[in-house]
């Protein structure tokens, strides 16, 4: 989850987020190399006494500054395209979860089970436990099994919303009249927090998302208790 004064990305809890972190570091490394090189070249230009008689016409340097950026962009584009395909790939999901955005709460339906659905509201600050997280805890958490492919279908009933859990690398728009989908796999047990990431009205900041990841045997017991 997000912590105070954290300048980096959240710790990854899914393979997709690990790949996103790697791509971020890869891109930042390239940007640092470009910045250092440009700073060095600009410094050399300003602090030397040489003159160039061919300043107005330099075909060689024009070829270099055309080809070199193209090569650099290829090193960024290919990993980016690979990630885009991974984010859209659906790999035989074990469970399908449907999230429906409302002003200003979420509804969830487990499509694999009959009559397993609930609404999820933020717990007000005056009703929060001492160990609760302000503006992040909900009355009904999403319970999902560990180390299994999960497909999520997202839509909305009124205005645009966005279902987002940063530590899982998931962000998908909830659009009225349209069903969007993505998949993810949680490789760590625990609680994962997110929020609506599309401004949707006065209480937009009061639409938290909480996922509780548990082993499969505990998930089966939870499903049985809910259905009974």
From Swiss-Prot:
- Write down the membrane topology: Multi-pass membrane protein
Superkingdom: Eukaryota
Q: By its UniProt entry, which Gene3D superfamilies does this protein fall under?
A: 1.10.287.90, Cupredoxins - blue copper proteins (2.60.40.420)
Q: Which UniProt keywords apply?
A: Copper, Electron transport, Magnesium, Membrane, Metal-binding, Mitochondrion, Mitochondrion inner membrane, Respiratory chain, Translocase, Transmembrane, Transmembrane helix, Transport
Bilayer-crossing regions: 27-48, 63-82
Q: Which cofactor does it need?
A: Cu cation
Cofactor binding note: Binds a dinuclear copper A center per subunit.
Entry's localization field? Mitochondrion inner membrane
- Mind listing the GO molecular function terms for this protein? copper ion binding; cytochrome-c oxidase activity
Sites binding Cu cation A1 sit at 161, 196, 200, 207
Q: Reaction(s) catalyzed by this protein? A: 4 Fe(II)-[cytochrome c] + O2 + 8 H(+)(in) = 4 Fe(III)-[cytochrome c] + 2 H2O + 4 H(+)(out)
Question: Which positions bind Cu cation A2?
Answer: 196, 198, 200, 204
Can you quote a single GO CC term?
Answer: mitochondrial inner membrane
The biological process GO terms on file are: ATP synthesis coupled electron transport
Do you know which CDD domains this protein is assigned to?
CcO_II_C
Question: What function does the entry list?
Answer: Component of the cytochrome c oxidase, the last enzyme in the mitochondrial electron transport chain which drives oxidative phosphorylation. The respiratory chain contains 3 multisubunit complexes succinate dehydrogenase (complex II, CII), ubiquinol-cytochrome c oxidoreductase (cytochrome b-c1 complex, complex III, CIII) and cytochrome c oxidase (complex IV, CIV), that cooperate to transfer electrons derived from NADH and succinate to molecular oxygen, creating an electrochemical gradient over the inner membrane that drives transmembrane transport and the ATP synthase.
Which family does the entry's similarity section mention? Belongs to the cytochrome c oxidase subunit 2 family.
Q: How does it assemble?
A: Component of the cytochrome c oxidase (complex IV, CIV), a multisubunit enzyme composed of a catalytic core of 3 subunits and several supernumerary subunits. The complex exists as a monomer or a dimer and forms supercomplexes (SCs) in the inner mitochondrial membrane with ubiquinol-cytochrome c oxidoreductase (cytochrome b-c1 complex, complex III, CIII).
Q: What is this protein called?
A: Cytochrome c oxidase subunit 2
Q: Which organism is it from?
A: Culex quinquefasciatus
């Amino acid at each position: 989850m997000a912590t105070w004064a954290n300048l980096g990305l959240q710790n990854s809890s899914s393979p997709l987020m690990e790949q996103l972190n790697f791509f971020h570091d890869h891109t930042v490394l390239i940007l640092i190399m470009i910045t250092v090189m440009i700073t060095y070249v600009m410094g050399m230009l300003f602090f030397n006494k040489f003159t160039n008689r061919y300043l107005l016409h330099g075909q060689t340097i024009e070829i270099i500054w055309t080809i070199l950026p193209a090569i650099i962009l290829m090193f960024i584009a290919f990993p980016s395209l690979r990630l885009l395909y991974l984010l859209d790939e659906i790999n035989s999901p074990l469970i399908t979860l449907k999230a429906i955005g409302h002003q200003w709460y979420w509804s969830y339906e487990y499509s694999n089970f009959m009559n397993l659905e609930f609404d999820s509201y933020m717990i007000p600050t005056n009703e929060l436990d001492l160990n609760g997280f302000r503006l992040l805890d909900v009355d009904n958490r999403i319970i999902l099994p560990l180390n299994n492919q999960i497909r999520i279908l997202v839509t909305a009933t009124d205005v645009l919303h966005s279902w987002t859990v940063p530590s899982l690398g998931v962000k998908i728009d909830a659009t009225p009249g349209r069903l969007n989908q993505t998949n993810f796999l949680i490789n760590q047990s625990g609680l994962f927090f997110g929020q609506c990431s599309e401004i949707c009205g006065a209480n937009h900041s009061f639409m938290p998302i909480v996922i509780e990841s548990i082993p499969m045997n505990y998930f089966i017991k939870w499903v049985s208790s809910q259905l009974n």
